Regions:
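Catalytic pocket-lining loop regions of alpha/beta-barrel enzymes
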Residues: 119, 134-226
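Short, flexible/disordered intra-domain loops and linkers
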Residues: 26-35, 62-75
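Hydrophobic faces of well-ordered beta-strands that scaffold small-molecule active sites
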Residues: 14-18, 54-56, 92-98, 121-123, ...
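Active-site environment of divalent metal-dependent phosphoester hydrolases
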Residues: 21-23, 61-65, 100-104, 128-129, ...
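Active-site gating/metal-coordination segments in enzymes
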Residues: 69-151, 207
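Conserved, mostly hydrophobic/aromatic
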Residues: 17, 46, 81, 113, ...
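Mid-to-C-terminal alpha-helical segments outside catalytic/metal-binding sites
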Residues: 1-20, 25-53, 222-224, 237-271
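Divalent metal-dependent hydrolysis catalytic cores, especially in the metallo-beta-lactamase
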Residues: 18-19, 40-69, 92-97, 119-123
């Protein structure tokens, strides 16, 4: 008889969209007083679900910008992420922050982080840092991301600005976060059909709508969809179950979504 652990370990899962932390200040879960999560809990929870690697950026739960020093705040988040990489090792893939008001600083930071093995930018969350995807300062940053082969994860916002950003930078790989409701999902699909450099991760709202994943795969293919949970905001067990237990998916489709696409985009080699 298969146990839960044996069953889950059959799958190699990479959670492309998380916001892990080493200190309570950076725990952005909504009900943290009832969870009291630690960095050890993150590792245990994910490993028990068959997740072999997590990806993503750090965010601050206390304030969007510490003391008004936007760039200082961003740099602190990036250094904390590198510290977390030293703690977790291969379990964690760093996601770094940039800011279009600080183009030179962002480009220099990308070079610094790239030399330390960082391949992921984002999740970009403009509302936390008071900009949007129409900001002209993003152009040089996103072009450099393409040159460096870095993947850009971005929070779903208004469709027109997402369209323009992705279309302006054809040599840069983008992964939109959150399918959301049907209207937004359909626009994600349209954007992905029009731009081969655009993918979608399944974190946040949307995956619980039965049939949305089948629609997404039929329209753009399982090779364009990545597993993500948005941990610790969302419960990763719900997302693991939504993929593994979905009888409308083939095993091959599950494999692409759960880890195959993340491995390919981030050039990850593991089991």
């Amino acid at each position: 008889m298969k146990t839960k652990e044996n069953f889950l370990q059959e799958y190699d899962i990479i959670d492309f969209h998380t916001h892990p932390f080493l200190e309570p200040k950076y725990d952005i879960s909504f009900h943290k007083e009832y969870l009291r999560l630690t960095q050890e809990d993150t590792f245990r929870i994910m490993k028990n679900l068959g997740v072999s690697k997590i990806c993503g950026s750090m965010l601050s739960a206390d304030a969007d910008v510490d003391g008004g020093d936007v760039w200082g705040h961003i740099k602190t988040l990036n250094r904390k992420a590198l510290e977390m990489k030293r703690y977790y090792g291969d379990f964690y893939e760093v996601g770094m922050h940039i800011h279009p008001d600080y183009v030179q600083e962002s480009c220099a930071e990308m070079e610094y982080m790239r030399k330390r093995g960082v391949k992921l930018i984002g999740e970009l969350v403009p509302r936390r840092f008071n900009y949007d995807y129409t900001h002209k300062g993003l152009d040089d940053i996103l072009e450099l991301a393409g040159e460096y082969g870095m993947v850009v994860s971005f929070h779903s916002m208004d469709d027109a600005s997402m369209d323009a950003m992705v279309e302006r930078h054809k040599n840069t790989t983008f992964v939109a976060a959150h399918p959301l409701e049907k209207t937004t999902l359909l626009r994600h699909i349209e954007r992905m059909k029009n731009n081969e450099n655009c993918y979608l991760d399944l974190s946040g709202t949307g995956l619980f709508r039965f049939g949305m994943l089948r629609r997404l795969i039929n329209e753009v293919g399982s090779e364009r969809v990545l597993f993500g949970s948005d941990y610790p905001i969302c419960s990763p067990s719900m997302y693991v179950g939504a993929i593994i237990l979905d009888e409308t998916l083939t095993e091959r489709e599950k494999a692409w979504i759960l880890s195959g696409n993340a491995k390919r985009l981030l050039n990850i080699t593991q089991k």
